[in-house]
Amino acid sequence: MEDFVRQCFNPMIVELAEKAMKEYGEDPKIETNKLAAICTHLEVCFMYSDFHFINEQGESIIVELGDPNALLKHRFEIIEGRDRTMAWTVVNSICNTTGAEKPKFLPDLYDYKENRFIEIGVTRREVHIYYLEKANKIKSEKTHIHIFSFTGEEMATKADYTLDEESRARIKTRLFTIRQEMASRGLWDSFVSPREAKRQLKKNLKSQEQCASSPTKVSRRTSPALRILEPMWMDSNRTATLRASFLKCPKK
């Protein structure tokens, strides 16, 4: 699974996912299914915000790469992928600026057009079940919930899907591609089944124990991709270039 993740996702996404796991004391080299799930969720959050801007009239518009209107305001503020301290700083800033109610849990995005926080979900199960779990956890009507599945289904608060159909179709197509690529490598069953995932986790732990006594050279260098992209990622005036730079799974 780890090889698949590194082949299928942009290096920046993988590094952000690894940082998030380590922040919670989890090992991305062992819990590879969780790493894949976090990478998928991150990419969906980025794709959700791709190309969406707000013009001077306050209208939501879609601007493709290469368009001269690069100074337009991004419609969505991405919160997911930041470390917790920075994420809460962004949330507090948004609340102070817009008057939005501060959420109890960190959301994934903020929609400047609809003036609401958004919680994005990507599930391997039934969308309505995952939606109810999210709603029960958040317990706030102020946070909008939007759930996607790997089968092309989706569910959103009050059936308000926020994005246009084409933008949502891009996300669904990407999720379906990830599923197909996992299946072709024999990874999908363990990604979906808790029992199979537990078996794979034990296998990973055993493999790591065997390698523990072997001398390992650890690189301390920051990857070129992250070194270039991270300043843009942290910049509130980031362009759509970062948002659209994600790699597709290579053909076998």
From Swiss-Prot:
Q: What GO MF terms are annotated?
A: RNA binding
Looking at the UniProt record, the site noted as Important for efficient shutoff activity sits at: K202, K203, K206
What are the recorded Gene Ontology BP terms?
viral RNA genome replication; viral translational frameshifting
Identify the main location.
host cell
**Record's compositionally biased regions (Polar residues):** 207-217
- Which region ranges are annotated with the description Disordered? 203-222
**Keyword DNA damage appears in the UniProt entry:** no
- Residues flagged as site, Important for efficient shutoff activity and nuclear localization: R195, K198, R199
Where is the protein found, in the record's own terms? Host cytoplasm; Host nucleus
Under the heading InterPro entries, the entry gives:
PA/PA-X, PA/PA-X_sf
Top-level taxon: Viruses
Q: Does the keyword Transport apply?
A: no
| Active site location | E80, D108
Could you tell me the keywords of this UniProt record? Decay of host mRNAs by virus, Eukaryotic host gene expression shutoff by virus, Host cytoplasm, Host gene expression shutoff by virus, Host mRNA suppression by virus, Host nucleus, Host-virus interaction
Segments forming a coiled coil: none
Instruction: Please explain the role this protein plays, according to its UniProt record.
Output: Plays a major role in the shutoff of the host protein expression by cleaving mRNAs probably via an endonuclease activity. This host shutoff allows the virus to escape from the host antiviral response. Hijacks host RNA splicing machinery to selectively target host RNAs containing introns for destruction. This may explain the preferential degradation of RNAs that have undergone co- or post-transcriptional processing.
The written remark on domains in the entry is: The probable endonuclease active site in the N-terminus and the basic amino acid cluster in the C-terminus are important for the shutoff activity. The C-terminus acts as a nuclear localization signal. The C-terminus is recruited to host protein complexes involved in nuclear Pol II RNA processing.
User: Which family would the database say this protein is a member of?
Assistant: Belongs to the influenza viruses PA-X family.
Q: What is this protein called?
A: Protein PA-X
